[in-house]
């Protein structure tokens, strides 16, 4: 059986470590490369020393040297992703991207790169969250115009971007279902809104603390009842396994920009 050769950027990070394990243990994939910065003290060290599931022949290697991989996975910060994306295009290697906190210029780069290679970009790779995106759209279309919508998210103290990419994806899914322009209806700071809540708005609340992997709740509140749709992740392996699934799906796909909804056939 031919296995998909996976290369992981940011292999020494929290998500990178989970991706190394997932790539090493899934039946149809194998960890072919674990990339770190050229200044990393891990450079040249056998990955198996830190992750017993990894093949003993794989060492941490310089992210500038991409060889012998079928697909690349990147969950690093935006600055790193930009460099890695250029490398992937130059080498003609498909790429799975889970980086959050991207700006408009970054999204333009993604779209341009997708003219040359197949890319899966998703803010969350868990199956549950992607099912949630469908559920919130259904809920948004079933309630009347007097519905109030709020999104709450919680993550570990180290997460930089806020609201999370997943929270924004939930809000955008709801706005799309309602026919709203998300940028015009999103409210991120109510302390400066000196008036009652408008019905045509989506509010965001954020918590950062401890080691929370990720929690998201969409509230649909109207007079006399409230619907709460919640997803809680207890392990980063949830996202890592989803990314490995996306990587296997992406191989041999034509150039283009895909998302996890495509991978799971939820569209």
From Swiss-Prot:
It comes from the Bacteria. Its EC number is 1.17.1.8. NAD(+) binds at residues 10-15, 98-100, 122-125. InterPro entries: DapB_C, DapB_N, DapB_N_CS, DHDPR_bac, NAD(P)-bd_dom_sf. It is an enzyme of class 1 (oxidoreductase). One of its GO terms (molecular function) is NADP binding. GO terms for biological process: diaminopimelate biosynthetic process; lysine biosynthetic process via diaminopimelate. Pfam families: DapB_C, DapB_N. It is found in: Cytoplasm. The active site is at 155 (proton donor/acceptor), 159 (proton donor). It catalyses: (S)-2,3,4,5-tetrahydrodipicolinate + NAD(+) + H2O = (2S,4S)-4-hydroxy-2,3,4,5-tetrahydrodipicolinate + NADH + H(+); (S)-2,3,4,5-tetrahydrodipicolinate + NADP(+) + H2O = (2S,4S)-4-hydroxy-2,3,4,5-tetrahydrodipicolinate + NADPH + H(+). (S)-2,3,4,5-tetrahydrodipicolinate binds at residues 156, 165-166. Keywords: Amino-acid biosynthesis, Cytoplasm, Diaminopimelate biosynthesis, Lysine biosynthesis, NAD, NADP, Oxidoreductase. GO terms for cellular component: cytosol. Catalyzes the conversion of 4-hydroxy-tetrahydrodipicolinate (HTPA) to tetrahydrodipicolinate. Belongs to the DapB family. This is 4-hydroxy-tetrahydrodipicolinate reductase. It comes from Pseudoalteromonas translucida (strain TAC 125). The lineage of its organism: Bacteria, Pseudomonadati, Pseudomonadota, Gammaproteobacteria, Alteromonadales.
